[in-house]
Protein backbone atom coordinates (compact mmCIF):
# COMPACT_ATOMS: atom_id res chain seq x y z
CA UNK A 1 0.00 0.00 0.00
CA UNK A 2 2.84 2.42 0.85
CA UNK A 3 5.79 0.76 -0.92
CA UNK A 4 6.02 3.65 -3.40
CA UNK A 5 5.26 6.40 -0.86
CA UNK A 6 7.69 9.32 -1.28
CA UNK A 7 9.34 9.43 2.12
CA UNK A 8 12.12 11.87 1.14
CA UNK A 9 10.31 15.06 2.15
CA UNK A 10 9.84 13.64 5.65
CA UNK A 11 13.54 12.87 5.85
CA UNK A 12 14.29 16.49 4.94
CA UNK A 13 11.99 17.82 7.67
CA UNK A 14 14.25 17.32 10.65
CA UNK A 15 13.27 17.67 14.30
CA UNK A 16 15.05 20.27 16.43
CA UNK A 17 18.44 19.07 17.66
CA UNK A 18 18.64 17.61 21.15
CA UNK A 19 20.41 20.56 22.73
CA UNK A 20 18.60 23.30 20.81
CA UNK A 21 16.53 26.18 22.15
CA UNK A 22 13.48 24.72 20.38
CA UNK A 23 13.82 21.35 22.10
CA UNK A 24 14.28 23.10 25.43
CA UNK A 25 11.10 25.11 24.80
CA UNK A 26 9.20 21.97 23.86
CA UNK A 27 10.27 20.25 27.09
CA UNK A 28 9.17 23.32 29.07
CA UNK A 29 5.80 23.18 27.29
CA UNK A 30 5.44 19.47 28.13
CA UNK A 31 6.13 20.18 31.80
CA UNK A 32 3.04 22.41 31.80
CA UNK A 33 0.86 19.57 30.49
CA UNK A 34 -0.46 17.49 33.38
CA UNK A 35 0.02 13.75 33.14
CA UNK A 36 -3.41 12.23 32.50
CA UNK A 37 -2.80 8.52 32.75
CA UNK A 38 -6.47 7.61 32.21
CA UNK A 39 -6.69 9.67 29.00
CA UNK A 40 -3.33 8.36 27.78
CA UNK A 41 -4.28 4.72 28.35
CA UNK A 42 -7.65 5.24 26.63
CA UNK A 43 -5.96 6.39 23.42
CA UNK A 44 -2.81 4.24 23.43
CA UNK A 45 -4.57 1.41 21.58
CA UNK A 46 -5.48 3.10 18.31
CA UNK A 47 -7.68 0.30 17.03
CA UNK A 48 -9.79 0.23 20.20
CA UNK A 49 -10.08 4.02 20.24
CA UNK A 50 -11.58 4.09 16.75
CA UNK A 51 -13.77 1.07 17.46
CA UNK A 52 -15.18 2.91 20.49
CA UNK A 53 -15.75 6.05 18.42
CA UNK A 54 -17.67 4.02 15.84
CA UNK A 55 -19.77 2.44 18.58
CA UNK A 56 -20.45 5.79 20.27
CA UNK A 57 -21.58 7.21 16.91
CA UNK A 58 -23.81 4.28 15.95
CA UNK A 59 -21.70 3.05 13.04
CA UNK A 60 -23.41 -0.32 12.63
CA UNK A 61 -21.21 -1.92 9.98
CA UNK A 62 -17.84 -0.81 11.39
CA UNK A 63 -15.01 -3.01 10.11
CA UNK A 64 -12.19 -2.99 12.65
CA UNK A 65 -9.91 -4.71 10.14
CA UNK A 66 -9.53 -1.36 8.34
CA UNK A 67 -7.66 0.24 11.25
CA UNK A 68 -5.58 -2.89 11.81
CA UNK A 69 -4.55 -3.01 8.14
CA UNK A 70 -3.66 0.69 8.02
CA UNK A 71 -1.55 0.37 11.17
CA UNK A 72 0.29 -2.65 9.76
CA UNK A 73 0.82 -1.11 6.32
CA UNK A 74 1.97 2.31 7.60
CA UNK A 75 4.32 0.95 10.27
CA UNK A 76 7.33 0.39 7.96
CA UNK A 77 7.20 4.01 6.73
CA UNK A 78 6.92 5.36 10.27
CA UNK A 79 9.67 3.10 11.62
CA UNK A 80 12.01 4.05 8.79
CA UNK A 81 11.55 7.73 9.67
CA UNK A 82 11.96 7.10 13.39
CA UNK A 83 15.22 5.23 12.78
CA UNK A 84 16.42 7.85 10.31
CA UNK A 85 15.88 10.79 12.68
CA UNK A 86 16.59 8.82 15.89
CA UNK A 87 15.25 11.55 18.18
CA UNK A 88 15.28 10.62 21.88
CA UNK A 89 12.02 10.75 23.82
CA UNK A 90 11.56 13.89 25.95
CA UNK A 91 11.96 11.99 29.23
CA UNK A 92 15.25 10.58 27.93
CA UNK A 93 16.69 14.07 27.51
CA UNK A 94 15.20 15.52 30.69
CA UNK A 95 15.48 12.97 33.47
CA UNK A 96 13.20 15.13 35.67
CA UNK A 97 10.33 14.85 33.20
CA UNK A 98 7.89 12.22 34.39
CA UNK A 99 6.17 10.14 31.72
CA UNK A 100 3.38 7.62 31.48
CA UNK A 101 5.36 4.59 30.33
CA UNK A 102 3.79 2.34 27.70
CA UNK A 103 4.97 -0.53 25.55
CA UNK A 104 4.41 1.64 22.49
CA UNK A 105 7.28 3.92 23.56
CA UNK A 106 10.15 1.63 22.58
CA UNK A 107 11.08 3.44 19.36
CA UNK A 108 12.60 6.88 18.76
CA UNK A 109 10.33 9.87 19.20
CA UNK A 110 10.14 11.56 15.78
CA UNK A 111 7.67 11.49 14.13
CA UNK A 112 4.80 10.36 16.35
CA UNK A 113 3.52 7.10 14.91
CA UNK A 114 0.31 7.37 16.91
CA UNK A 115 -0.35 10.82 15.43
CA UNK A 116 0.38 9.59 11.91
CA UNK A 117 -1.73 6.47 12.19
CA UNK A 118 -4.53 8.28 13.99
CA UNK A 119 -4.84 10.86 11.21
CA UNK A 120 -4.54 8.24 8.47
CA UNK A 121 -7.22 6.02 9.99
CA UNK A 122 -9.57 8.91 10.80
CA UNK A 123 -9.35 10.14 7.21
CA UNK A 124 -10.12 6.71 5.75
CA UNK A 125 -12.96 6.04 8.21
CA UNK A 126 -14.45 9.48 7.55
CA UNK A 127 -14.64 8.63 3.85
CA UNK A 128 -16.15 5.21 4.47
CA UNK A 129 -18.63 5.99 7.25
CA UNK A 130 -19.08 9.74 7.41
CA UNK A 131 -18.92 10.89 11.02
CA UNK A 132 -15.91 13.04 10.12
CA UNK A 133 -15.90 15.23 13.24
CA UNK A 134 -16.02 12.22 15.57
CA UNK A 135 -13.24 10.31 13.81
CA UNK A 136 -11.08 13.45 13.50
CA UNK A 137 -11.57 14.18 17.21
CA UNK A 138 -10.35 10.68 17.99
CA UNK A 139 -7.25 11.30 15.86
CA UNK A 140 -6.65 14.57 17.74
CA UNK A 141 -7.13 12.83 21.09
CA UNK A 142 -4.66 10.12 20.10
CA UNK A 143 -2.11 12.75 19.12
CA UNK A 144 -2.74 14.87 22.24
CA UNK A 145 -2.46 11.81 24.46
CA UNK A 146 1.15 11.33 23.36
CA UNK A 147 2.02 14.82 24.62
CA UNK A 148 0.03 14.22 27.83
CA UNK A 149 2.10 11.07 28.36
CA UNK A 150 5.26 13.13 27.78
CA UNK A 151 6.09 10.48 25.18
CA UNK A 152 6.48 13.01 22.38
CA UNK A 153 7.45 16.60 21.79
CA UNK A 154 4.76 18.78 20.20
CA UNK A 155 6.78 18.83 16.95
CA UNK A 156 6.73 15.01 16.86
CA UNK A 157 2.95 15.03 17.02
CA UNK A 158 2.60 17.86 14.52
CA UNK A 159 4.81 16.13 11.97
CA UNK A 160 3.22 12.76 12.68
CA UNK A 161 -0.18 14.25 11.91
CA UNK A 162 1.18 15.71 8.67
CA UNK A 163 2.65 12.33 7.77
CA UNK A 164 -0.77 10.76 8.34
CA UNK A 165 -2.35 13.31 5.99
CA UNK A 166 0.22 12.54 3.31
CA UNK A 167 -0.21 8.77 3.71
CA UNK A 168 -3.95 9.26 3.26
CA UNK A 169 -3.36 11.44 0.19
CA UNK A 170 -1.13 8.69 -1.19
CA UNK A 171 -3.94 6.14 -0.82
CA UNK A 172 -6.39 8.47 -2.55
CA UNK A 173 -4.11 9.08 -5.54
CA UNK A 174 -2.91 5.52 -6.16
Q: What annotation goes with each model-predicted range?
A:
Residues 1, 173-174:
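Short, solvent-exposed mixed-charge patches
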Residues 1-149:
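Hydrophobic alpha-helical bundle signature of multipass membrane enzymes
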Amino acid sequence: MFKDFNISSFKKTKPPSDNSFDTDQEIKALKKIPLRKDFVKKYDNIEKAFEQTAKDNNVKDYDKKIAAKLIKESAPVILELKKYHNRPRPYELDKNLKAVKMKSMNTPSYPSGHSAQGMLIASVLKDKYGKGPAFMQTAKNISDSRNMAHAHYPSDSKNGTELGKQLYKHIKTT
